[in-house]
Amino acid sequence: RVMKMKQLNPRSVRDQIYQVLKEEIMKFRLVPGEQISEKEISERYEVSRTPVREAFLQLSKEGLLEVYPQKGTRVSLIDLDLVEEARFMREKLEKAVAELACEDFPQEAMFKLEQNVKMQELSIAQKNYESLFELDEAFHQTIFEGCGKANVWAAIQQMNVPFQRIRFLRLAADFNWNTIHQQHAALTEAIRTKQKAKAKEIAEEHLQLVIVDKQM
């Protein structure tokens, strides 16, 4: 796949390369352990090596690439310990935010949740796990933002990458799609009817779906 990225602004080129490579890694088009090179990427997208090198550096900071001077660059393997740490953090924070949402949640945010749940149903019917993955993330982000905790959500993203990679892999394997949708629908209803205990329970169960089995 060749995509030209001719932009006057080098930062824009770097950002585009970064976003494309991140999506390819997160969605396993570039698989863990796969070798990639600055030369290959710069030729594929017809850009100089400088923005590619900068994109590689950013991806390595996020734990998605491992860069070895004089040896090359590869897509990082998934560290299951980091996955479990991220899941643990999200479980604790999402339970707290679910309770907050039951106290006060804007109507506009509630509408977004309801529409999101409907779109998840459509994604499942179409067997579109990439869309379901994106809707899942957007669903949780909407709850945080609706509670005035957008900065907390942004902070979570710093540890969230290994967790997201496992979640995407499991969705691709047709892992509990309907259960995920049902839990989102139930959590939306619990928030709408201000059932704190129920919302907290569902949030915990939802994150328990991705407890890492290190024998898998």
Question: Residue spans of the language-model regions?
Answer:
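Amphipathic alpha-helical repeat elements characteristic of tetratricopeptide repeat
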Residues: D15, E91, Q107, F111-E114, ...
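Short linear motifs at protein or domain termini
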Residues: R1-E103, Q141, I211-M216
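Residues in well-ordered alpha-helical elements
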Residues: D15, D81-E84, E130, A150, ...
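Hydrophobic, amphipathic alpha-helical faces that serve as interaction scaffolds
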Residues: M89-F105, E137-D174
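C-terminal all-alpha effector/ligand-binding and dimerization domain
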Residues: L8-P10, K95, E114-E121, Q126, ...
